[in-house]
Design a protein with these regions (language model features):
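Alpha-helical transmembrane segments and their immediate juxtamembrane cytosolic regions
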Residues: 2-319
């Protein structure tokens, strides 16, 4: 084992250090995710997907597919860095309330932006239907996911903080298995409920259960970041680990595409959101793999990169 490497302690409960101030690289990573969403949605909304040539989709909608996965991963990372070490403290109820108030704020802006998105194209009755969760919009739905997640994630943070590593990894595996099983159910024909929980192919929204594993992976990365970020050698190892994992996942996507016999078709399928709702293997390998690579680059750049890309960092700090 290389020097300074610590063996994994599968049964030990985490003893997390308190954060040493705001980590600008996290804001930068979130800002990159939001920036990619803006590029993707601007083309969809202003140009229209039908008006974009097939291979015009690849540099725009193919490469921007990292955005939602990066946003969700950074959500978990930020919670770990800012809140996880405080879950056993006396002021945890106040911190939890802060997250819930943030959920209300995000939910308000989600609904306000939903009206703005739908107003030019839909009659009032359909907009009201969307406001009452009778249907979903498109471009603002990541905010709807974010608002709901901010309600339940604070409830499980104390349990997560007390769980040994094997329990946390088992939880991620169990949620993936639960998602696969729930995807096979019809939910009594209630497509909206299915979409909110595990995604539905006819609705452009992120399921809370189907995307929960990414939040929890973000928590694990956030724990590692707390231990590594302010030690240059450890941070370098973390960056290389994330970069390698991301590259392997993207390579896995291309291996599947090559095995299918038509790599360009596989790339166009991802660009056209095939496998996004509900999550499919190829899409998730590419999206999460790319997100991990972008995250690694943001962490490698650290405060200097955050300062050089200040507009993105500012966007990420306010999200």
């Amino acid at each position: 084992m290389p020097p300074n490497w610590s063996p994994l302690k599968w049964t030990e409960k985490p003893q997390l250090p308190k954060g040493e101030g705001r980590i600008a690289a996290i804001d930068l990573a979130r800002g990159i995710a939001i920036g990619l969403m803006i590029v993707s949605h601007s083309v969809s909304g202003l140009v229209g997907i039908r008006n974009v040539p097939d291979w015009g989709m690849v540099p725009i909608h193919f490469l921007t597919k990292f955005s939602s996965s990066l946003f969700i991963l950074v959500f978990g990372i930020a919670l770990a860095v800012a809140f996880l070490s405080y879950t056993q403290s006396d002021d945890w109820p106040k911190r939890r309330l802060k997250l819930w108030l943030r959920a209300v704020e995000v939910w308000f802006w989600y609904k306000a932006l939903l009206v703005i998105e739908m107003l030019p194209f839909y009659p009032p009755n359909e907009i009201v239907d969307a406001l009452l969760y009778g249907r979903f919009a498109i471009w603002v739905e990541i905010l709807g996911f974010y608002a709901i997640a901010l309600l339940w994630v604070p409830l499980m943070l104390p349990l997560w903080a007390r769980a040994p590593l094997w329990g946390r990894l088992a939880t991620i595996g169990a949620l993936i298995a639960l998602t696969i099983w729930l995807q096979s159910l019809t939910f009594g024909g209630n497509d909206i409920l299915k979409a909110l929980l595990v995604d539905h192919e006819d609705h452009y929204t992120w399921g809370q259960i189907s995307r929960a594993p990414m939040i929890l992976v973000g928590l694990l990365i956030g724990e590692a970041l707390l231990r590594c970020y302010f030690d240059s050698a450890k941070r370098r190892r973390l960056v290389l680990t994330l970069l390698s994992l991301g590259a392997l996942m993207v390579a896995g996507f291309y291996a599947l595409a090559f095995a299918s016999g038509d790599v360009p078709a596989a790339m166009l399928a991802v660009a056209n959101n095939v496998g996004k709702h509900p999550p499919g293997l190829g899409f998730m390998l590419f999206s999460v793999g790319g997100a991990l690579m972008l995250l690694a680059l943001a962490l490698a750049g650290g405060a200097k990169a955050a300062k050089a890309l200040l507009p993105l960092t500012m966007v990420g700090s306010d999200a």
